[in-house]
């Protein structure tokens, strides 16, 4: 995968690590990348995952002429994930609110995985996502897709803010969200109840 991802480390790289489903918002991200490419011609975006929207995503990449900006890497293993996180500056996954769908957005483990690497996230105010990404603390929460371009632009242009959000995300992941620490908290809670 290292050969497939030839990235310029001097420019921020965005990542979506999720199944390719309509509700994960890939189409909105690609539209934003297209819009922002006018300002940042070298913007880089990695899509890791597979799903029923793969062909649609490929068509959109071609229609927006983003072949040199977007890398589709498919399903990745843990070692590949570590490599990709080492190349990522911004995690982005603006899930669509599908209130009446069979599947809703849970906590968002991918955000926490990114946080462990000091990567801030851009996410939607949907389901359990605001519990995983704290707005203006560990990333940015958007309320609608009109805010997506501006949120990406904010983190691309403001490196210091991006670094601070990433550090906050990493500290929170290490100190509050690691499973072992959660188990201790739950055990204490159970003991207190008894």
Regions found by a protein language model. Name each.
Residues 7-24, 30-33:
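Conserved donor-binding/catalytic core segment of Leloir-type glycosyltransferases
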Residues 55, 77-88, 116, 134:
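Short acidic alpha-helix that forms the nucleotide-activated donor recognition element
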Residues 86-104, 119:
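Acidic donor-binding loop of glycosyltransferase active sites
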Residues 111, 115-116, 120-123, 133:
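Short hydrophobic beta-strand element within catalytic cores of glycosyltransferases
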Residues 154, 161-176, 182-188:
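A short, well-ordered alpha-helix in the C-terminal region of glycosyltransferases
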């Amino acid at each position: 995968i290292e050969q497939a991802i030839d990235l310029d480390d001097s420019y921020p790289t965005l990542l979506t690590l999720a199944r390719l489903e309509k509700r994960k918002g890939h189409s909105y991200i690609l539209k934003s990348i297209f819009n922002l490419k006018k300002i940042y011609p070298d913007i880089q975006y990695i899509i890791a995952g597979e799903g029923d929207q793969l062909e649609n995503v490929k068509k959109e990449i071609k229609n927006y002429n983003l072949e040199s900006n977007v890398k589709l890497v498919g399903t990745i293993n843990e070692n590949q994930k570590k490599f990709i996180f080492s190349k990522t500056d911004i995690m982005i996954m603006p899930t669509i609110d599908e209130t009446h769908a069979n599947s809703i957005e849970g906590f968002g483990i991918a955000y926490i995985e990114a946080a462990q690497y000091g990567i801030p996230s851009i996410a939607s105010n949907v389901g359990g996502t605001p519990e995983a990404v704290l707005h203006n603390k560990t990333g940015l929460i958007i309320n609608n897709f009109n805010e997506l371009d501006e949120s990406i632009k904010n983190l691309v242009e403001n490196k210091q803010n991006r670094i601070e959000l990433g550090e906050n995300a990493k500290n929170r992941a290490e100190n509050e969200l690691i499973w072992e620490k959660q188990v201790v908290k739950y055990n204490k809670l159970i003991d207190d109840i008894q």
